[in-house]
Amino acid sequence: MRVAAYLVTLFCSLNLSSIVYAQDKHQDHDAGHRHHGAHVHGMATLDLVMDDHHLMMHLKSPLMNFLGFEHQPETEQQKSIYQDMLQQLAMLATLMEIKGSSCKAESIEVEEPFTDSDEAGHTDVDVSYFLSCEEPENITELKINLFDVYSNLETLQVQMVLPSGQQQLKLNQQRTSIRIQ
């Protein structure tokens, strides 16, 4: 897991300067505009870092996108939906198909979402995927399957650090693939 921590640190350091610049650049432009912050229903983020034979991904989403609610499950039906979500997110195939190379999940960590909700009751789920790929240079496409599984998800903001450089893009129900190379 040291490699995963390294990759997260690398990703954050590469993007910190652009975030600080963007914040400074638009500080005066904020008056009169409403900003949504990190918790927007219908939207999730996927950070992806590829280094050597490793592919690390971090998915963050409001629970509303995956469950249809953000509170602790109360009814038997809600408890069942919640357990199904945990099992689905712990399977790589729920997130994506990797085309061009064989990748194996070394570690998938789904964080308990109800330990960190804000005062307004907004709750996010965080999932970290750490993969080992046989021939990562042959990866041609990542097909994101989340939209097929979770109908409340409308947009996936993707930030990637690849050997070829950094890239940001938005995926939605019509555009579900990330071309690599």
Question: What spans do the regions from the language model cover?
Answer:
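Cleaved targeting-peptide boundary
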Residues: V20-R34
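Positively charged n-region of N-terminal signal peptides that target proteins for export
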Residues: M1-A5
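Bacterial N-terminal signal peptides
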Residues: L7-N15
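Intrinsic disorder/low-structure terminal segments
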Residues: L10-F11, V20, L146
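N-terminal soluble domains immediately following signal/targeting peptides that reside
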Residues: H36-Q181
